[in-house]
């Protein structure tokens, strides 16, 4: 319809958000050109943006359309997590390890898993796996077996959702003392939550911070 419209465009954390207007007139074709201002170049300083918690299914490793989505957000490393429960897994990935990575123009998508995940012990995340590892139903609460297998494969493992949602603090208390946990996802949904991270640091445990969107489930309003 004829009128004045507001245009808003963004591209990740290194570009300023563009805001402008465009007038649409009757009987005319209106073209608009947007130019995003980059205010910092973190890769040139050795820092690369990433999202450790995405749920997106792909049928093939080199999924150009999916790669385009995350590249538009300027996410250099996107970890696509196969999501499990006691019965099955969802968002299954086509390949694992090096074969499960698709790198183009400095932006990569890779396979990982969020499994095991329960409301009794929290949700766990495992990156850089050579193959997925899903516990049988009668051992599903034995989280330590997945952490140990992840490390045997050269993986990196931790707890999602601030280490608090879905009773993740219970899992942290059980697994951190045995040096099984590499990180806690403390930044999500626009919130930084550290109350289940600092106590372990104060006790002398090495526990890295992580950030993940949990797309498409979490958002700034949650």
Where are these regions (language model features)?
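Solvent-exposed coil/turn segments that connect beta secondary-structure elements
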Residues: 12-14, 39
């Amino acid at each position: 319809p004829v009128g004045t419209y507001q245009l808003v465009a963004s591209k990740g954390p290194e570009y300023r958000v563009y805001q402008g207007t465009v007038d649409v007139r009757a009987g005319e074709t209106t073209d608009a050109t947007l130019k995003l201002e980059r205010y910092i170049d973190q890769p040139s300083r050795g820092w690369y943006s990433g999202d450790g918690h995405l749920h997106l299914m792909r049928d093939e490793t080199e999924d150009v359309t999916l790669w385009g989505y995350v590249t538009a957000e300027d996410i250099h490393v996107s970890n696509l997590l196969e999501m499990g429960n006691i019965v099955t897994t969802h968002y299954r990935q086509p390949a694992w390890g090096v074969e499960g990575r698709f790198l183009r123009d400095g932006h990569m998508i890779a396979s990982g898993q969020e499994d095991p995940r329960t409301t009794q012990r929290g949700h766990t995340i495992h990156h850089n796996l050579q193959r997925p590892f899903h516990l049988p139903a009668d051992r599903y609460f034995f989280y330590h077996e997945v952490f140990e297998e992840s490390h045997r494969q050269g993986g990196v493992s931790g707890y999602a959702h601030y280490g608090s949602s879905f009773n993740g603090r219970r899992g942290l208390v059980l697994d951190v003392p045995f040096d099984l946990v590499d990180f806690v996802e403390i930044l999500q949904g626009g919130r930084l939550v550290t109350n289940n991270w600092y106590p372990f640091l104060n006790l002398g445990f090495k526990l890295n911070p992580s950030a993940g969107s949990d797309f498409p489930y979490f958002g700034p309003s949650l």
